[in-house]
């Protein structure tokens, strides 16, 4: 009886860990399916629409980042929550996978963040210079390339510093504490600076939309349609920013607490780390829902793709 009672809490913790991992993996699977759908919708639109606009390409870029993020973190959810981070594959092959895994984990989040900033810059150009095409298709592809290159350069030192660390019989893929603190602080700075830039850009966009004067040769109907489209996109992008930072804030709080040496305050809160991970994973689920809610054309195209028909109207114009 004594042995049974001693093993009961262990069994309960194991069951709880499996339940948490299952929930996280389910959320990531939904995120994967939704973002694949987004890419398919935009691909159909890109092939058939005469307006291959930058918004659609940037949204597709966010979805691609979310797809990679989901694929990478589905096994991670089980590894972190059930195996306590124990890295099963070791040796030279395991070491290479460890370095690649940590490298990709940094890239996907920063890429999504920089792409949202790129959309803000694009919308600023559209609103302030409606008759000039400043961001061409070629420029757009170059910006997308930069949204992957900049995070890759930031994460490049991981290939050197990532290694196996053994503690209490568990081998994890990680960085030394001091290196981790530097990366966490750098990541926080990137998110803060991009947020600050987006706030300035969208404040300027909102001010311009509020006091905009259209040329006399634009009809009332065309003016109303343009205003409505700009307002819808403006609201959608603001919601994207709020969702990204709301979902990232808990994990960012954990990382900063570690970098600033008060991590113990949060580590003692039993479920905080799980909630932080779940919130982070939910962002990939929320983004496609935002596209559907705020964009009628995208909503229509989703229905047509699901019914195996083609969408021929421009999305995110």
Residue positions per predicted region:
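Extracellular N-terminal segment of 7TM GPCRs
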Residues: 1-41
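Loop architecture of class A 7-transmembrane GPCRs
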Residues: 2-11, 83-107, 129, 140, ...
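Intracellular effector-coupling site of seven-transmembrane GPCRs
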Residues: 56-65, 207-251
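Intrinsically disordered regulatory tails of 7TM GPCRs
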Residues: 1-11, 49, 211-235, 296-317
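Cytoplasm-facing ends of alpha-helical transmembrane segments in multi-pass membrane proteins
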Residues: 32-44, 70-77, 106-130, 144, ...
